[in-house]
């Protein structure tokens, strides 16, 4: 059975405690264990000791869809530093996710990556917390293999707990459809994706042009992008738009 959503609070709390007991071996570090299914990436699980406000804003705005660190991780199998060229090339100084990171001083770190056979990507993202950057970099470099193994064992443990929980509740399993867009937003984004103008969309749907712009604005905000053109492209690339 493929598990797309890791949203059991009890299991996630167990995993958080497991990580925290082991991560402290490497210093006073901030970490974020992020898991998402690459085919249905809209609802990642984030288990972290980062500030709760950061986690809430990151998830609410679906920043994992535009985060250069996560975008880089999709193409990686080895650990990498956040100042690696592969990350820098994806950075945008106007990116909402980096504005949020600077606000909480989450700017210097490393990411460890794992891709499993159920199409999930797991990352263990570590930043230096109260450690100075030089000693932090040295400590991570020395312990790279151990931290990568921590990610592997953690992810295997998490999959095992969810599989066990799924087996217990197999008869009660129901698929809950989770959409990032409202039905109206999806309609408008669909017509925009096939080349219709705001004026044409307003005629097709029998609504005002200003209403079309309002919903497009919501789509832009949800995806954390700069404009409608970028939102449409991202919606197409990630297959977020349902056909009408």
UniProtKB/Swiss-Prot annotation:
Pfam entry (one): GerE
Listed transmembrane segments: none
UniProt xrefs under SUPFAM superfamilies: C-terminal effector domain of the bipartite response regulators, Pheromone-binding domain of LuxR-like quorum-sensing transcription factors
Keywords: Activator, DNA-binding, Quorum sensing, Transcription, Transcription regulation
UniProt xrefs under PROSITE patterns: HTH_LUXR_1 (PS00622), HTH_LUXR_2 (PS50043)
Domain HTH luxR-type: 174-239
GO MF entries: DNA binding
The UniProt record lists the keyword Transcription regulation: yes
DNA-binding region: 198-217
Biological process terms in GO annotation: quorum sensing; regulation of DNA-templated transcription
Function: Probable transcriptional activator. Binds to autoinducer molecules OHHL and HHL.
Family the entry assigns: Belongs to the autoinducer-regulated transcriptional regulatory protein family.
PANTHER family according to UniProt: DNA-BINDING TRANSCRIPTIONAL ACTIVATOR DEVR_DOSR
UniProt name for this protein: Transcriptional activator protein YenR
Species in which this protein is naturally found: Yersinia enterocolitica
Gene name of the record: yenR
């Amino acid at each position: 059975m493929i598990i797309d959503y890791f949203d059991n609070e009890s299991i996630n709390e167990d995993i958080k405690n497991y990580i925290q007991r082991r991560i402290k071996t490497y210093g006073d570090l901030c970490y974020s264990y992020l898991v998402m299914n690459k085919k249905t990436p809209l609802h990642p699980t984030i288990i972290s000791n980062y500030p709760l406000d950061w986690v809430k804003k990151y998830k609410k705005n679906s920043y994992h869809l535009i985060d250069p660190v996560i975008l880089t991780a999709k193409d990686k199998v080895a650990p990498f530093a956040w100042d690696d060229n592969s990350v820098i090339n994806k950075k945008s100084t106007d990116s909402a996710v980096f504005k949020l990171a600077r606000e909480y001083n989450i700017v210097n770190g490393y990411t460890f990556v794992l891709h499993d056979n159920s199409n999930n990507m797991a990352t263990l993202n570590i930043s230096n917390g109260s450690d100075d950057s030089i000693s932090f970099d040295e400590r991570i470099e020395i312990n790279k293999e151990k931290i990568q193994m921590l990610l592997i064992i953690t992810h295997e443990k998490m999959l095992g707990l969810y599989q066990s929980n799924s087996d217990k509740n197999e008869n009660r399993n129901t698929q809950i459809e989770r959409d990032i867009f409202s039905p109206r937003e999806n309609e408008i984004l669909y017509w925009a994706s096939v080349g219709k103008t705001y004026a044409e969309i307003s005629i097709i749907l029998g609504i005002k042009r200003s209403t079309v712009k309002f919903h497009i604005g919501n789509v832009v905000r949800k995806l954390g992008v700069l404009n409608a053109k970028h939102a449409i492209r991202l919606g197409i690339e990630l297959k977020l738009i349902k056909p009408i």
